[in-house]
Amino acid sequence: MIKRNRFRCVLSTSMLAVGACCVVVPAVLHASSVAGTEIDTELDLLLTRTARDLTGRIKLLEGQVRSSRASASVDLARGVITVRLDRAFLPRDYGPAFEDQRSLIDNALLTVTEPYLHVSQVKYLYGGFDIYHYFPEVKQEDDKAREAGERIRREKQERQRIGIVTGSGVAFVAAGHGYYLDHKDRVWKTQREEHNGIMEGMLTPSYAAELKSALESRSQMPVYRPRVQGGAEAHPESGREWWRMAARYAVAAQYPGHPDIWNTHAGSAAHDREYKEDINSRPLLANHLGAEVAIHMHSNADDTGAARGARVIVQPGRSVDAALGASVLCAMKELIRSAPGYGDFIVASAPHAADKGENRLAAMPSIIVETAFHTHPEDAAALLDPVFRAASMKGVEKGYRLFRDGKDCTPLALSKIDRVTVPANGAAETNVRFDGHPQFPITLSFTPVYCTQPGACRAEEKTVAEASASPIKVQMSCEGSGYGMVNWSTVMRDADGVTSGPVEHWMTCQGGG
């Protein structure tokens, strides 16, 4: 029999790290197949009602006429919604206001489908044709940037193959929106209205600053932000503080010799031409700088105020950007849900594809991060919370870093801790195996579930500061000469508060001879 206090376990650790991929499979409704397309009639009716309701009351753009025959349906197998509208619903001009209008329709439709499946894209047909049929120049912009990006990647891969260091190593982080000059009334306007105490263009700089800090410290790369960062200095023409101004104006001040970046609508009579130039200036400047990645920070909006959660928008047809978006969402989910109070915060399971100028003109992997909906009261409260801001931006950084390094985003999990036998008054190592990519330092918490001698085994923690890969080498010690067994329940927690589930493992202390 073991005497009390003669059997005590002491733990010390050293460490090493690994990852794998996880796939989220959406649930579907009761589906039937028509001409090779999986459909759900009831869901299509809901989508059609939603599309008709919104297009029947949404603010029309110049040249638009209400669509009398709006309908919508979803291909369950492909996860794509198709919206069919009259040709008369086309605006006179394709620009950011039209993209914003479609985003409101997208978000209303996605709110309908979210409980059942992930929709990757909402496509629109106007009189039976897609938007590029009427605005071929938009498709040409997309094709030009896509081809440039593919050429840059091929050249980079070839230089790497022969041992030449390539790339600028710069990340481009753009805070969306800000003040612009509307030439209709010659008034300086914000690109977004206030909701729940949030003006999007005044919020995004704080998120861009948070992400910049995380990228510089963790991804070890310089970051360029096109909007002015803080300070009380006033923009001369508007009288507003510089940090409140849209990126276009800071870019014009810094690059006066490159109107091809910030004055892309020179000669246009459109009242919102500087708004359009602001959208264009961000990706065009990223191209000019040769940035490795472009991340555009936004908050989201919904007409009904019902939509919630974080989303990432990528350009349709760009698989590299989609891979980056998926990695960012995966890491955002892990980091946000590890933050106090956000354990059930909604994060999209995969990116959404939508044609947006910020991504369309970019020749590098480019994503729009819609961190939360400022039109929903609880999401808005989260957006104003420094805890949420830090967690979400650490998630964006981690997702990018894993993508850059060719690693899959895998949730942190302890997979196995080997059983070990320890000599009396001695120590022995065992392996702690884990999945995922924890942020160091990490803490291992050991709690006894069963102990041969009750009270002889006590819970302990050990912190490991040096980053390494799985498996962790854990030195486990027995004090005293008595024989005993312990069943431990162990949890790993990283520096960001990401915690694994518990795993149980056994240790035997050999008695002295």
List the model feature ranges, each with a label.
Residues 496-513:
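Short beta-strand elements
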